[in-house]
């Protein structure tokens, strides 16, 4: 390869990092992180970023374009209900910028039956498609992945990413995002498997990781609807359903993930099934009993913790 061809190749490969570091992309990511963290504590680093954004933006751009940007360690924040791996405001902004550009590029490549991706209609669209078609099919199979985010294999994920991304600086950032370091109250650990929850880039990575499953279902010609790691298959015959289940198991084995034993079901559609918190039958949708049970349990915990009436009201309003 002569020098001119090599330079042209490098220029093409570097277009992606230029788009991520572009002023419009960083401004959109900045607006997003400001909105998401507008109610954070006054000691939160979001306020430092907001105060110094005019000076910090060109510095971030320069670091990205030189391949010198590195993500800091994540902190673990413990709440009464969960543990949250927390990115600093600046890292969250950069991850959002990467997500904005990659989503634009990958959206046409990802299955139209994957509904959790931005612009696909979300949970309501997934439920609507299942509800509209369930009456035309006799059998269903639904499942999801046990501990999906924590189970994602970095090597298998990046093998898929590298089919779409050639920019070495972006690939380096994505490896840095995956092989992160977590600070849990002074205990430090390196992460070698799984992706981060609560990260703006993770839903897109979660969509890409199961793309082989999406493609396999499309080839079978069954009705298939996926929302993140939760999906349902509708089939006209037992033979068609068995073939789909066999394909699902084969793809999950290749991706080194396992079905959740408590969220896997199959049978006749007339008996109904639980999907995304709703009970689905040919007659329509209603909130699943398990969803109501979780709501009651949450309200009980809030009462035990001495939550104010206004906080409980906010939770119930959000739940509805």
List PLM regions with ranges.
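Conserved two-metal-ion catalytic palm core of "right-hand" nucleic acid polymerases
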Residues: 1-166, 170, 181-185
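Active-site and adjacent loop segments of nucleotide-processing enzymes
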Residues: 2, 276-320
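Conserved polymerase palm-domain catalytic core
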Residues: 63-64, 71, 112-113, 118, ...
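Short acidic-glycine loop/turn motifs at beta-strand connectors
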Residues: 80-81, 236, 282-283
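A short local loop/turn or secondary-structure capping micro-motif enriched for an aromatic residue
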Residues: 94, 150-151, 243, 284-285, ...
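A generic secondary-structure boundary signal that marks alpha-helix termini
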Residues: 106-107, 257, 304
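Short, charged/polar, Gly/Pro-enriched secondary-structure boundary elements
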Residues: 240-244, 274-276, 282
